Structure formats: structure tokens, C-alpha cells
A protein has these predicted regions:
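Extreme N-terminal starter segment of soluble prokaryotic enzymes
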Residues: 1-3
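Active-site neighborhood for divalent-cation/phosphate handling
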Residues: 115-191
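Short beta-strand-loop/turn "lid" adjacent to the catalytic site in phosphate-handling enzymes
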Residues: 76-122, 150-158
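Conserved active-site "lid/cap" helical segment
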Residues: 37-85, 129
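Short glycine-rich, Thr/Ser-proximal phosphate-binding strand/loop in the N-terminal lobe
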Residues: 12-56
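Conserved small/polar residues in nucleotide/adenosyl-binding loops
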Residues: 192-198
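A short acidic Gly-Thr/Ser loop motif
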Residues: 6-11
Length: 199
């Protein structure tokens, strides 16, 4: 099974294609300066790494170039995008709505959009990436992975700020916790390296 992992910024698109059977990275790369002059893509596969200029008016064109790099030339790592079984999208803010990763639907996209005031630089970029991927990859299943989900079990005494409660009620102002995907990975690995019990 091959999984494409995506991390979109407002003007960037990081990607990594992983063969889950052997947990091997088949390729990885970065599209930069999307929507600006002098866009570029750096693609690495088969021991070959190259940065080339490109024209990326939107994330859709960037995704199309990623597909081209993965399926042609020296950086080719698959014959066709139909080999990709699923796509994972990093989404920075899931607010109180998303406590775990979930399959992306129109309703999920709308909810991520509603949460954009909590992450105005990141969530809109995540939506751009999801919508662009849908155009390029069609019906490939896509999953949203939320940075905030790891921290969703914090009790109120840990997440409430010493500010008027109405800010929480009206605007959702509270501690959420970030970089949860990194914490989720590092926690069990740390226990293993320190030879501690995981329970």
C-alpha cells in the first residue's frame, strides 16, 4: 500500500510518498512560492535530488507537477497515480470538533473552514491542499490528521486561560496544544529507547 502524505502551507506544499509494506520512503519533495513568481519544486527519489523552476499559480498546478515528478523522469517512483491507496493531509487546527484523524468529506472541509479563525494562516492553506488534491487525485480516500488531536484529552483545568469565560464561549479561546503528530510519534519511541513500560 502506498500512502501520499501532504503538508500544505499558504505558499508551499511538502509531500512524501511511502510504501507502507516496507515502510520505505519512495520520494519526497517541496513545492515553494506557490502563487508567486519564481516558483520551484525540489523532488528527491532513487538517490536523485533536483530543484527545478516551475509555474504554480495555485496548489492545483503544484499537485499536478508532483504527479509528473513521481511518474516520469529520473525522479519516477511509481508508474501511475492509481498506485496511491490513500492521502493523508496535515491540518493544524481541529478545535474541539476533531479529536482524532478522520476521513475527509465535504462536511469535514466545511468544519475545518469554520475553525480557520483559530489558525488563520494554516487551516485555509490546508483546505487549499485538500481541494487541489481532490482535483488531481479524484476519489482516492483522503484523511485529515490534526495537530491538536493529540492534546484533546486535556482537562479544563489545563486548557482554560485566566481570562473572561465569555472569550472561550464566543471565540473558542483556550489552550489547544500543537505539533501533536510529532508528540504522538515521539512519545512511544521515547519509552522504547528509555526501556520504560508504555502503560
Amino acid at each position: 500500500m502506498k500512502i501520499l502524505v501532504i503538508n500544505c502551507g499558504s505558499s508551499s506544499l511538502k509531500y512524501q510518498l511511502i510504501d507502507m509494506d516496507g515502510e520505505k520512503v519512495l520520494c519526497k519533495g517541496l513545492c515553494e512560492r506557490i502563487g508567486m513568481e519564481s516558483s520551484m519544486i525540489t523532488h528527491e527519489a532513487n538517490g536523485h535530488k533536483a530543484t527545478t523552476p516551475a509555474i504554480f499559480p495555485t496548489h492545483t498546478e503544484a499537485f499536478a507537477e508532483v504527479v509528473k515528478k513521481m511518474t516520469t523522469g529520473e525522479g519516477k517512483c511509481i508508474d501511475d497515480v492509481s498506485e496511491i491507496s490513500a492521502i493523508g493531509h496535515r491540518v493544524v487546527h481541529g478545535g474541539e470538533k476533531f479529536k482524532a484523524s478522520c476521513l475527509i468529506t465535504d462536511e469535514v472541509i466545511n468544519t475545518i473552514r469554520e475553525l480557520s479563525p483559530l489558525a488563520p494562516l494554516h487551516n485555509p492553506a490546508g483546505i487549499l491542499g485538500i481541494e487541489a488534491a481532490r482535483k488531481v487525485f479524484g476519489n482516492v480516500p483522503m484523511v485529515a490528521v490534526f495537530d491538536t488531536a493529540f492534546h484533546s484529552t486535556m482537562p479544563p483545568k489545563a486548557y482554560m486561560y485566566a481570562i473572561p469565560y465569555e472569550y472561550y464561549e464566543k471565540y473558542g479561546v483556550r489552550r489547544y496544544g500543537f505539533h501533536g503528530t510529532s508528540h504522538k510519534y515521539v512519545s512511544p519511541v521515547s519509552y522504547t529507547h528509555l526501556t520504560l513500560p508504555t502503560n
